[in-house]
C-alpha cells in the first residue's frame, strides 16, 4: 500500500478552498449573457470552445492532490445539477464557492461546522419553499421560446426551434440533438410511432420513385415469433383480403414460403401488404410490440398468452389511419387505440423511468414514451466550422433541458433575481433559530443568494454589489438585464429561469459545500518521483 500524505484542520480547509476557487474561477466566467467562452485543449483534434459550466468543470484536474479533492467535490455539484435539471451548472458552481468561502471564514473564526451545516440545510429548505411560491407555470409557446433563448445564450433561433419542437411532440415527446451536414440548423419532426425496421422486400413499395410503401386505413398484425410456413398464416390473410383493407405485418421474422406468398399476392393480385421485422431485441422487443398493440387498438398475438396465429381474427388486429414504410424505417400515424389504455401505458412507462437506476434503460424507456405519446423531434445543428457546431450543440442541449425543466416545475424571474427575492423570507426566518451557529449558517446562505446576480453583473463589466443593491430596492419581478444594461421586469422581458434549475443548483451547491465545511482531514497518496535517468544503452557486441 502506498504511503499517504495527510493534512489536518486549517491546512486541510485551505487546500480545499484553493481547489474550489481554482475550479470556480474557470467556470464562472461563462455565466450570464455577457459570459465568456472557455477553450479546452484536446489530446487529439481541434480545441473545444464552450460556454457550458459542466463541460468546463469536467476537464479540470489539479496537480496538487489535496487541492484536487476540493475541485472534484465542486465538479460533483455541476454534475449533480446537470443530472437533475440539465442546466444551471454554472449557477450551482458559483453558489457552492460562495457558500464554502463564507462558511470557511466562520469556521476559522470558531463556529461549529456541524451547526453551520444544519443552519445551511434549514435555510435552503426555506428558500426552496419560497421559490416554489413565486414560481409560475409555463402556459404559452412564447414562454417556452424565452426560456430556451436565455439558456442558449440569447440565441432566439435556437429558442424558437425548441419551442416549435415542444409544441409538435408534446411534453412527453422526445427531442434529440444531432450534428447537421450543412450550415443551417433545422428541425425534423416524425409524428406517430416510428421504429428503425424497414420492409423485408422492395416489392412491397407502392411508390417506385420514393421507394415507400404507404398503406391508408391499414390493419396491423403483431406477432412475436417467426412466420415461415403459409398454413398457419393463411386464415388471417383470407379475412384481411375479404375486408379489402391493406395489411402491415410485424413479426420477429418473415421468411421462406410466407414471404414469397406475400410478394406474389402483392404483385399479381394487387393485395396491399407489407412485412417488417419487429423492433428491438429480447424483453425490449416484446415491450415495444405491446406498445404498438396498445397504440393501434390491437392485440399482440403471443403463444405465451395461449394465442395461435391460425386462430387470429380481424378483431385482434391493430388499426391505423396511415402507415409509411421505407427500406430503413416504419412510421405508424394515428393509431386507433383506446385513449385511456394509451395513457395508462404511458403512466406505466413513466413509473418505470422513475424506478430505473440505469441511464441506458431510462433513455430507452424515454424513447418508448415519446413514441407512444407524441413523436420524435430531431434538431440538426449546422455551422460553418466543426468547432462552432460543437459549441452551438452544447447550447442547444442546455436549452432543451432548461425547457423540459420549465414545463415540469414552472418558471421564475431570471438573471439571479429569484434568489435575491428570497432574502426577505430568509431574514424573517432568522429569529426562529435559537442556536447562534445555525443562525450563522443561515446568514451564509443569505449572502450566497446574491452571488449569481453579482457574477452576471461582473461578467458584464459592472460592479456586482451596486447592481445587487439596486435590484433589492426594486419590486418583485424587477431585475438587472445584463444584455441591455437596464433594470426591467424580468418576466415581461422574457428573461426567465426554470424553477427546477434554480432549485437544483441551490440544493446541490449547499449539499457539497456543507460536506466540505465539515471536513477536518484530507488523505492522499504521496506522488511517486519519476526517474529521470535514461535507459541503459545495449553494449556493442550484443546479438539481436
Curated annotation (Swiss-Prot):
It catalyses: ATP + H2O + a folded polypeptide = ADP + phosphate + an unfolded polypeptide. GO terms for cellular component: cell surface; cytoplasm; symbiont-containing vacuole. ATP binds at residues 30-33, 51, 87-91, 415, 481-483, 497. GO terms for molecular function: ATP binding; ATP-dependent protein folding chaperone; isomerase activity; unfolded protein binding. One of its GO terms (biological process) is protein refolding. Pfam families: Cpn60_TCP1. Induction: By stress. Keywords: ATP-binding, Chaperone, Cytoplasm, Isomerase, Nucleotide-binding, Stress response. Its EC number is 5.6.1.7. It is an enzyme of class 5 (isomerase). It comes from the Bacteria. It is found in: Cytoplasm. Together with its co-chaperonin GroES, plays an essential role in assisting protein folding. The GroEL-GroES system forms a nano-cage that allows encapsulation of the non-native substrate proteins and provides a physical environment optimized to promote and accelerate protein folding. Forms a cylinder of 14 subunits composed of two heptameric rings stacked back-to-back. Interacts with the co-chaperonin GroES. NCBIfam families: GroEL, PRK00013.1, PRK12849.1, PRK12850.1, PRK12851.1. Belongs to the chaperonin (HSP60) family. This is Chaperonin GroEL 1. It comes from Chlamydia pneumoniae (Chlamydophila pneumoniae).
Amino acid at each position: 500500500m502506498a504511503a499517504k500524505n495527510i493534512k489536518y484542520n486549517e491546512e486541510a480547509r485551505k487546500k480545499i478552498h484553493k481547489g474550489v476557487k481554482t475550479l470556480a474561477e474557470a467556470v464562472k466566467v461563462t455565466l450570464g449573457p455577457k459570459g465568456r467562452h472557455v477553450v479546452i485543449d484536446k489530446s487529439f483534434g481541434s480545441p473545444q470552445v464552450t460556454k457550458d459550466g459542466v463541460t468546463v468543470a469536467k476537464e479540470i484536474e489539479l496537480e496538487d492532490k489535496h487541492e484536487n479533492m476540493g475541485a472534484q467535490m465542486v465538479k460533483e455539484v455541476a454534475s449533480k445539477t446537470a443530472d437533475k435539471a440539465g442546466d444551471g451548472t454554472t449557477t450551482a458552481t458559483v453558489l457552492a464557492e460562495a457558500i464554502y468561502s463564507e462558511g470557511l471564514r466562520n469556521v476559522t473564526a470558531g463556529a461549529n461546522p456541524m451547526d453551520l451545516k444544519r443552519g445551511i440545510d434549514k435555510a435552503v429548505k426555506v428558500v426552496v419553499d419560497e421559490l416554489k411560491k413565486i414560481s409560475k407555470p409555463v402556459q404559452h409557446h412564447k414562454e417556452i421560446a424565452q426560456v430556451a433563448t436565455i439558456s442558449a445564450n440569447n440565441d432566439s433561433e435556437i429558442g424558437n426551434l425548441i419551442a416549435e419542437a415542444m409544441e409538435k411532440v408534446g411534453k412527453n415527446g422526445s427531442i434529440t440533438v444531432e450534428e447537421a451536414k450543412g450550415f443551417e440548423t433545422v428541425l425534423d419532426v416524425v409524428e406517430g410511432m416510428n421504429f428503425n425496421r424497414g420492409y423485408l422486400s422492395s416489392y412491397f413499395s407502392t411508390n417506385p420513385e420514393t421507394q415507400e410503401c404507404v398503406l391508408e386505413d391499414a390493419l396491423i398484425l403483431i406477432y412475436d415469433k417467426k412466420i415461415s410456413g403459409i398454413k398457419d398464416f393463411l386464415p388471417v390473410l383470407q379475412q384481411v383480403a375479404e375486408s379489402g383493407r391493406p395489411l402491415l405485418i410485424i413479426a420477429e421474422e418473415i421468411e421462406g414460403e410466407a414471404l414469397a406468398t406475400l410478394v406474389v399476392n402483392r404483385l399479381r393480385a394487387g393485395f396491399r401488404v407489407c412485412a417488417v421485422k419487429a423492433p428491438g431485441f429480447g424483453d425490449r422487443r416484446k415491450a415495444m410490440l405491446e406498445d404498438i398493440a396498445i397504440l393501434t387498438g390491437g392485440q399482440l398475438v403471443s403463444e405465451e398468452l395461449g394465442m395461435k396465429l391460425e386462430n387470429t381474427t380481424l378483431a385482434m388486429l391493430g388499426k391505423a389511419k396511415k402507415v409509411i414504410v421505407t427500406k430503413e424505417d416504419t412510421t405508424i400515424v394515428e393509431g386507433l387505440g383506446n385513449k385511456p389504455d394509451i395513457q395508462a401505458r404511458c403512466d406505466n412507462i413513466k413509473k418505470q423511468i422513475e424506478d430505473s437506476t440505469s441511464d441506458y434503460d431510462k433513455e430507452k424507456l424515454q424513447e418508448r414514451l415519446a413514441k407512444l405519446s407524441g413523436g420524435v423531434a430531431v434538431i440538426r445543428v449546422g455551422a460553418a466550422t466543426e468547432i462552432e457546431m460543437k459549441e452551438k450543440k452544447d447550447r442547444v442541449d442546455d436549452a432543451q433541458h432548461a425547457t423540459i425543466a420549465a414545463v415540469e416545475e414552472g418558471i421564475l424571474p431570471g438573471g439571479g433575481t429569484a434568489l435575491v427575492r428570497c432574502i426577505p423570507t430568509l431574514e424573517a426566518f432568522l429569529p426562529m433559530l435559537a442556536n447562534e451557529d445555525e443562525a450563522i449558517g443561515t446568514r451564509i446562505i443569505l449572502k450566497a443568494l446574491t452571488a449569481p446576480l453579482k457574477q452576471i453583473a461582473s461578467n458584464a463589466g459592472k460592479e456586482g454589489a451596486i447592481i445587487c443593491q439596486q435590484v433589492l430596492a426594486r419590486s418583485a419581478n424587477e431585475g438587472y438585464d445584463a444584455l441591455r444594461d437596464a433594470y426591467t421586469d424580468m418576466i415581461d422581458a422574457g428573461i426567465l429561469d426554470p424553477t427546477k434549475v434554480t432549485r437544483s443548483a441551490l440544493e446541490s451547491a449547499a449539499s457539497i459545500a456543507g460536506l466540505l465545511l465539515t471536513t477536518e482531514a484530507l488523505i492522499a497518496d504521496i506522488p511517486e518521483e519519476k526517474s529521470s535517468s535514461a535507459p541503459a544503452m545495449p553494449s556493442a557486441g550484443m546479438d539481436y
